[in-house]
C-alpha cells in the first residue's frame, strides 16, 4: 500500500517523529517490530495495496486490549507512546495510541478534532486514515469496530479540524497583521476539514450587521464561538466585511455566538443563535419582553445524537411465570426517550407474574440506570425480589452490571457487553400483579435531583442574568423565563465554578 501514499501525505502523516508536544522517544522501531508480523500474511494477499484493510488488521489487534476512559488527565502535553501501554485516558490519548502504531507501519494516519462540540460541553478527538484516492476514513478507537467513511460519522461536530505537524501557512499569513489573535488560532497546526465530513449537510452562517449589538470595524477579525459551560470557545474566525459576518462550512444543530478578541479576552458582539441541522435556518435567541412558565427536568436538552436516554426506545417490560422467560407477556413498550430522572408507567396487567424484567431494545446494550416495580399504582415502596439478569458489562470490570438496575442509585447503570439480548429483572418469589413501574435511563448525572440547589440564568447582551435559586422538591423545577432566551442551569450542590455539572443549551426545557 506504500505506493499509494503521496509524498505530501508521507511527510505529514507518517514521517513525523512526534504528534505534538510529547517527550521525545525512540518509539518507531519498537512498535514496528511488535506489530509488523501482523501484516506478513496480508502483504502476500491480493489486497496488499489496500490501506484500509491494512489499518483494519492493526486496529482489530489494538482493540483486544482493555481500555479505561477517564477525563481526569490534566490538560497539557501529550503523554507519548506510553498511551499504548497505559490504555487509559480520554479520546486524545486513545487517538495518540493509534497514530503511533499506524505510522510505525507506514499507514498515513492522524487526528481530526472538534475544538468545541456544538451540542455538549466537550472537545473531541478521533483518528483518520487516507485511502489510495485520499478519501478520509475515521475511527473512534477503541470503541468503533471498523473504519468508516468520514461522511458516515454522525455526531454533531460544528467545525472539524485536522491536526498537522506543519503550520497552516495560509491561515498564518491571513492573521499576521491582526494585533491580537486568540490563542487557539495563534499557531494553527491544523486545517479545516469540515466539508470532508459534512458533504451536502455543509452549511453557511451569515449574520447581518443589524443582528450585532456591538458592530466591529470593517476588516476586524470575528470569531464563531460555541458554548462550554458558562464560557464561549472560538471554533472559527473570519473578517467582518462591513455588512455581515460570514462563516462557511459549519454543521447545523449548534448554538453559537459571535465575538472579537483583545487583551481583555473575548468580547461578544451578538446574542446567541442556532443553526438548524436540516434546513440551515438561523434562529436568533434575542430574549423577548414576554415571559412563560417552563418545567426543567435536566441541565441540558438531549440534542446529542444517540444519547443514552434514546437507547431505551424499543425496550420492553415483560412478565413471566417461567424463570427462563420462554412464555412471556409484554407489559410495556417504551416508544419515546425518557426526559426526566423518574418516568412513571402504569402497566395494568391481565394476570400475575413471578418474574418481571426490563429487556433492552436492539443495539441498546440494555442501557438503563434504575427500575422499580409496584403492586398497586398508589404504592410508594417498591417490590422486593431476587435480582436476575444477563451478566457481563462493557469492559468486563464489574462496574456496570445488571445488579445496578436495582441498587436504588440513579447514577449507576447497566451497560451490557453485547448490543442486544441484555435484560435485568426480579424474581418476586411468587406471582403478583405489578401495576406500576418507575424507570431511569442511563445518564451523566445531569437530571434534576431532589434537595439540590439550582440557579437558572438567561443570556442577554453580553452576560448571564440570574432568574433565581431553587431547592428541588422533586425531579423538576418550575421557572418563569423570558421567551426565546438561551438558558443555563447551574447546580450549586454538586458542582463548583470550575467543574460544575452545568450545561448551556437553547430550549432545553419542556413547557
Segments predicted by a language model, with ranges:
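Linear, non-domain "peripheral" regions
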Residues: 1-48, 271-273, 360-362, 500-505
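A short, amphipathic beta-strand motif
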Residues: 203-213, 502
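Disordered, acidic Ser/Thr/Pro-rich linker "stalks" and the adjacent N-terminal cap
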Residues: 288-343, 348-352, 363-434, 440-449, ...
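Short, ordered, surface-exposed loop/turn motifs in non-cytosolic proteins
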Residues: 212-230, 310-315
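Short, acidic Ser/Thr/Gly-rich low-complexity loop/linker segments typical of extracellular
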Residues: 229-243
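Structured interaction patches on ligand/partner-binding surfaces of diverse proteins
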Residues: 262-289, 504
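Short Pro-Gly-centered beta-turn/loop motif in secreted/extracellular proteins
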Residues: 244-256, 261-263
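Hydrophobic/aromatic-rich core segments of domains that either
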Residues: 40-61, 72-81, 86-87, 92-184
Amino acid at each position: 500500500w506504500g505506493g499509494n501514499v503521496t509524498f505530501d501525505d508521507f511527510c505529514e502523516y507518517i514521517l513525523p517523529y512526534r504528534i505534538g508536544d510529547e517527550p521525545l522517544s525512540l518509539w518507531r522501531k519498537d512498535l514496528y517490530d511488535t506489530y509488523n508480523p501482523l501484516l506478513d500474511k496480508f502483504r502476500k494477499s491480493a489486497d496488499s495495496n489496500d490501506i484500509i484493510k491494512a489499518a483494519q488488521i492493526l486496529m482489530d489487534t489494538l482493540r483486544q486490549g482493555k481500555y479505561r476512559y477517564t477525563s481526569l488527565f490534566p490538560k497539557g502535553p501529550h503523554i507519548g507512546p506510553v498511551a499504548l501501554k497505559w490504555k487509559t485516558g480520554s479520546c486524545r490519548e486513545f487517538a495518540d495510541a493509534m497514530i503511533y502504531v499506524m505510522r510505525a507501519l507506514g499507514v498515513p494516519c492522524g487526528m481530526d478534532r472538534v475544538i468545541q462540540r456544538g451540542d455538549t460541553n466537550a472537545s473531541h478527538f478521533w483518528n483518520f486514515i487516507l485511502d489510495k484516492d485520499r478519501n478520509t476514513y475515521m475511527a473512534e478507537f477503541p470503541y468503533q469496530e471498523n473504519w468508516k467513511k468520514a461522511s458516515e460519522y454522525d455526531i454533531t461536530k460544528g467545525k472539524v479540524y485536522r491536526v498537522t505537524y506543519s503550520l497552516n501557512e495560509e491561515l498564518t499569513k491571513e492573521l499576521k497583521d491582526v494585533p491580537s489573535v486568540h490563542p487557539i488560532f495563534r499557531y494553527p497546526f491544523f486545517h479545516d476539514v469540515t466539508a470532508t465530513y459534512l458533504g451536502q449537510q455543509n452549511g453557511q452562517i451569515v449574520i447581518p450587521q443589524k443582528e450585532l449589538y456591538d458592530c466591529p470595524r470593517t476588516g476586524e477579525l470575528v470569531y464563531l464561538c460555541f458554548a462550554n459551560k458558562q464560557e464561549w470557545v472560538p471554533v472559527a474566525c473570519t473578517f467582518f466585511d462591513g455588512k455581515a459576518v460570514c462563516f462557511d462550512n459549519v454543521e447545523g444543530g449548534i448554538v453559537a455566538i459571535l465575538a472579537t478578541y483583545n487583551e481583555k479576552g473575548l468580547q461578544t458582539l451578538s446574542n446567541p443563535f442556532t443553526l438548524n441541522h436540516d434546513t440551515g435556518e438561523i434562529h436568533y435567541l434575542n430574549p423577548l419582553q414576554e415571559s412563560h412558565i417552563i418545567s426543567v427536568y435536566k441541565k441540558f436538552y438531549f440534542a446529542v445524537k444517540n444519547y443514552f436516554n434514546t437507547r431505551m426506545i424499543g425496550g420492553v417490560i415483560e412478565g413471566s411465570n417461567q424463570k427462563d422467560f420462554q412464555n412471556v407477556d409484554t407489559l410495556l413498550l417504551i416508544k419515546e426517550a425518557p426526559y426526566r430522572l423518574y418516568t412513571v408507567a402504569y402497566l395494568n396487567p391481565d394476570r400475575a407474574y413471578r418474574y418481571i424484567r426490563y429487556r433492552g431494545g436492539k443495539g441498546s446494550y440494555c442501557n438503563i440506570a434504575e427500575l422499580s416495580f409496584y403492586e398497586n399504582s398508589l404504592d410508594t415502596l417498591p417490590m422486593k425480589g431476587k435480582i436476575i439478569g444477563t451478566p457481563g458489562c462493557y469492559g468486563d470490570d464489574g462496574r456496570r452490571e445488571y445488579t445496578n438496575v436495582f441498587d436504588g442509585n440513579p447514577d449507576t447503570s447497566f451497560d451490557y457487553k453485547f448490543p442486544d439480548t441484555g435484560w435485568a429483572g426480579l424474581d418476586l418469589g411468587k406471582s403478583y400483579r405489578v401495576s406500576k413501574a418507575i424507570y431511569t435511563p442511563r445518564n451523566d448525572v445531569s437530571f434534576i435531583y431532589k434537595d439540590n440547589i439550582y440557579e437558572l440564568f438567561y443570556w442577554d447582551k453580553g452576560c448571564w442574568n440570574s432568574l433565581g435559586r431553587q431547592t428541588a422538591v422533586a425531579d423538576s423545577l418550575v421557572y418563569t423565563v423570558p421567551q426565546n432566551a438561551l438558558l443555563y442551569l447551574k447546580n450549586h450542590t454538586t458542582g463548583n465554578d470550575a467543574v460544575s455539572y452545568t450545561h448551556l443549551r437553547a430550549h432545553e426545557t419542556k413547557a
